[in-house]
């Protein structure tokens, strides 16, 4: 957290008289400031009284200690952290500016590409940089860059054959990857090498659906029916229409088996996740519960509620199901909260027709309300009109605990990656784009055709000398962000709906 400091100037004042000139070298005392008049102090007080003392799931465990905090001594970020329960690894907050950027789907100061190294870089002796995913509106797309492309050079730096060999190379790369203009050299997935110059865009529009495909026998040998593939990065309220369009495509194609790829999905808006589960649920389940949320003793049972398949704001059930009879989820350590909740909500209904391929999920069984500051009625007039110019802070304290219709929660512990264990564990294949050649997708299709998963691909070392360097800047967010994972409900929306 960044702390603010006040710099005081010490002034020497020359006193002039008609008899002689003297100089007073004693500094004037710095003007006193009232810490209780600072914006952070006001926000801290509101956070404690209106949010943490009311909505926080562990309020009974922390209220007494929080009442003793001298909030005039804390920045807003430090105050938020100080108010959390000792075992809470999920609550977090962000600035209004950050919230606006995320919800608008605009990424600033980015090439619109996620770079990584292989999970098995040590075993493979391959410390090169690959594209994990690329947003459709990234300027690199027009040069043929896709997931699986290998970055072999940037301004003034040529990557060694087997990737980083020294910390100096890693430092240079991290320092200069955002240079603009930038000259890139990539080896594309088809083996072609391309070199081009691009200017860093002011922002990149995101599309949280990475892929929506229908596979048939022409795409994968042995398929006797169409199989849908849906890859979603995050649940965002502003992109629900995109989910609708994708599933209209699957329904038209007669899809009965679906591969749902949530490997990088850390959760998000509860309305968006409810929309997805309503499409995925087998026919005839409209109106059936998929999650029950319980609150602290101050709010329970009045705010405890159950969400139902196909029930939305108009309180009328909608049969949105496309008639699936088998679903394969691709998930990973990055799959958290709302994405885990979709899987958990379907478990009682699909039983052995629900499969999990990839790696153990994050393990986040709870959710948050979206709590804005300022939160007076005047501010909400702006928010409800889609104007967030007055928004300063957004808080996401844990407010409720989730279980499915059979009372089962998402597995969790005090360490990350403590969630659902896959039926078939497979590493992330970043050497191939999302599709039938990607190992996890191929594994699901193989199971559909043969009834069993294929053996793991053999990792062949390309380098007999283990002298490569891992770039810590590529560490996944679930490892670096102690409060990773979201299942979000808008507080004002909740008041009107439940």
Give the residues covered by each predicted segment.
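Positively charged n-region of N-terminal signal peptides that target proteins for export
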Residues: 1-4, 19
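Sec-dependent signal peptide hydrophobic core
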Residues: 5-11
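Generic detector of ordered secondary-structure context
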Residues: 10, 39-40, 105, 338, ...
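C-terminal motif of bacterial Sec signal peptides marking the signal peptidase cleavage site
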Residues: 14-17
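Flexible, low-complexity junctional segments that flank or bridge functional domains
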Residues: 19-257, 266, 272, 282, ...
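C-terminal "post-core" interaction segments
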Residues: 242-245, 250, 255-257, 266-498
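Short conserved active-site loop signatures built around small residues
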Residues: 260
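Short strand-turn motif at the edge of the Rossmann-like AdoMet-binding core
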Residues: 263
């Amino acid at each position: 957290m960044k702390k603010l400091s006040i710099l005081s100037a010490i002034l020497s004042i020359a006193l002039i008289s008609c008899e002689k000139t003297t100089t007073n070298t004693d500094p004037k005392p710095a003007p006193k400031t009232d810490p209780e008049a600072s914006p952070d102090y006001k926000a801290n007080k509101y956070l404690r009284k209106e949010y943490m003392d009311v909505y926080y799931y562990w309020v009974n465990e922390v209220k007494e200690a929080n009442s003793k905090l001298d909030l005039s001594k804390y920045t807003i970020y430090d105050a938020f952290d100080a108010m959390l329960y000792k075992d809470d690894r999920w609550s977090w907050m962000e600035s209004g500016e950050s919230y606006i950027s995320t919800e608008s789907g605009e990424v600033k100061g980015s090439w619109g590409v996620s770079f990584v190294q292989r999970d098995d870089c040590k075993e493979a002796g391959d410390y090169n940089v690959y594209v994990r995913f690329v947003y459709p509106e990234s300027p690199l797309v027009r040069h043929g860059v896709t997931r699986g492309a290998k970055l072999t050079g940037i301004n003034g730096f040529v990557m060694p054959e087997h990737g980083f060999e020294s910390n100096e190379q890693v430092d240079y790369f991290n320092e200069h990857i955002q240079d603009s203009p930038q000259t890139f050299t990539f080896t594309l997935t088809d083996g072609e090498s391309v070199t081009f110059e691009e200017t860093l865009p002011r922002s990149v529009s995101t599309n949280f659906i990475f892929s929506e495909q229908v596979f048939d026998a022409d795409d994968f040998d042995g398929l006797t029916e169409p199989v849908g593939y849906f890859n979603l990065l995050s649940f965002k309220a502003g992109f629900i229409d995109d989910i609708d369009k994708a599933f209209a495509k699957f329904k038209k194609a007669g899809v009965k088996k679906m591969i749902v790829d949530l490997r990088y999905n850390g959760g998000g808006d509860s309305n968006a996740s409810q929309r997805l589960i309503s499409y995925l649920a087998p026919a005839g389940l409209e109106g059936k519960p998929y999650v029950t949320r319980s609150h602290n003793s101050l709010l329970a049972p009045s705010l405890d509620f159950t969400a139902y398949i196909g029930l939305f704001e108009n309180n009328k059930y909608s049969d949105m199901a496309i008639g699936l009879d088998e679903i394969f989820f691709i998930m990973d350590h990055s799959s958290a909260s709302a994405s885990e909740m979709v899987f958990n909500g379907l478990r009682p209904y699909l039983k052995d027709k629900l499969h999990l391929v990839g790696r153990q999920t994050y393990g986040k069984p709870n959710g948050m309300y979206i709590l804005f500051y300022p939160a007076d009625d005047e501010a909400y007039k702006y928010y409800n009109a889609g104007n967030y110019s007055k928004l300063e802070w957004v808080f996401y304290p844990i407010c409720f605990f989730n279980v499915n219709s059979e009372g089962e929660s998402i597995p969790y512990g005090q360490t990350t990656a403590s969630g659902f264990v896959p039926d078939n564990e497979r590493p992330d294949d970043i050497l191939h784009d999302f599709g039938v050649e990607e190992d996890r997708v191929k594994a699901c299709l193989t199971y559909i055709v043969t009834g069993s998963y294929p053996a793991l691909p053999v990792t062949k070392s390309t380098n007999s000398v283990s002298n490569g360097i891992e770039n810590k800047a590529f560490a996944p967010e679930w490892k670096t962000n102690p409060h990773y994972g979201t299942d979000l409900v808008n507080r004002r929306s909740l008041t009107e709906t439940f």
